[in-house]
Design a protein with these regions (language model features):
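Short, surface-exposed recognition loops or helix-turn segments adjacent to catalytic cores
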Residues: 30-33, 55-63
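Short linear Ser/Thr-Pro motifs
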Residues: 11-13, 37, 41, 149
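Active-site cofactor/substrate anionic-group-binding motifs, chiefly glycine-
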Residues: 1-35
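Glycine-rich anion-binding loops and their surrounding alpha/beta cores
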Residues: 5, 9, 24, 46-53, ...
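Active-site-proximal loop->helix
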Residues: 33-51
Length: 274
């Protein structure tokens, strides 16, 4: 998503991406470290002991093996390395917040994009259409999140087979029963990572519900489900079963095996001087 909603929430989209991967959906997440918030996707993944700067072939291996790969934006868009410090100093959203979701190196055909302003919904839908995206949801909630909210209605523009339509998700109709927005406020990378670990172990709270709502969107766009309520209930059942924590451990350990094997392949024909 664009980020820049100013809410400083927990890493909902990153957690939902990991949850989706534990449910068998292949996810190529494109992200960065924090710019206008305390903790970006790159920060929380590092705090979860997931390596974020793998080579493209290693990322592909991880997606094929564990259904999850993270593409660290500065590694793929070299100019961003020079822009990054200035963005951090500004501390507010800029045009680069809008560019990020449109520049995935994975060239995906299915995508969930959260935007910080409802006015951007159709703009992004048309941009993704021009980029050849097959199926996408662009989301913005009435309480200001660039995510599907567990507290308020979320407005969605759906792009499917070049057709654009409007839909909405109302958590009240889904009996989400989330408590209060303050329960989604995040902090530093360790704090946010611990929250992800807790819900993956089966802890039931507002964060878990928010993650399941956004994972449900992924199940719809991946065409695992056609009914959002069924997708949400499936995600809830899965996360409460603690299956996600076992998968997280595989993702944490997967890059080590990938790097080790790749290193052997790179150096097996080379001779080193003593």
């Amino acid at each position: 998503g664009t980020g820049g909603d100013g809410m400083n929430t927990l890493n909902i989209s990153t957690a939902s991406a990991l949850l989706l991967s534990s449910m068998g959906v292949k996810v190529a997440k494109h992200g960065n470290k924090a710019v206008s918030s305390k903790c970006g996707s790159g920060d929380v993944l590092e705090a979860l002991n997931i390596k974020i700067d793998l080579e493209p072939n290693d990322i592909e291996t991880q997606i094929n093996k564990n259904n999850f790969g993270f593409m660290f934006a500065p590694n793929y868009h070299s100019a961003m390395k020079f822009v990054g410090p200035t963005r951090k100093k500004i501390g507010k959203r800029t045009i680069f917040n809008l560019i990020g979701p449109l520049s995935s190196p994975a060239l995906v055909k299915r995508q969930i994009v959260g935007v910080f302003d409802k006015k951007l919904l159709k703009i992004f839908a048309n941009a993704l259409k021009n980029l050849g995206i097959k199926y996408a949801w662009i989301v913005n909630s009435e309480d200001g999140l660039d995510e599907i909210s567990p507290y308020a209605k979320t407005h969605i523009i759906q792009l499917k087979e070049n057709k654009i339509s409007e839909i909405s998700i109302d958590p009240k109709k889904l009996n989400v029963n989330a408590d209060k927005f303050e329960n989604l406020i995040g902090d530093d990378a360790k704090f946010n990572a611990d929250k992800i670990i807790n819900i993956f172990k089966g802890e039931d709270n507002d964060f878990s519900k928010a993650v399941c709502l956004n994972a449900a969107a992924g199940l719809i766009v991946n065409e695992n489900h056609i009914n959002f309520a069924d997708a949400y209930n499936n995600a809830r059942e899965h996360i409460l079963s603690s299956k996600a924590i076992k998968h997280l451990e595989k993702v944490q350990n997967g890059w080590k095996c990938s790097w080790k094997n790749n290193s052997k392949e790179k150096f097996k024909d080379k001779k080193f001087k003593k």
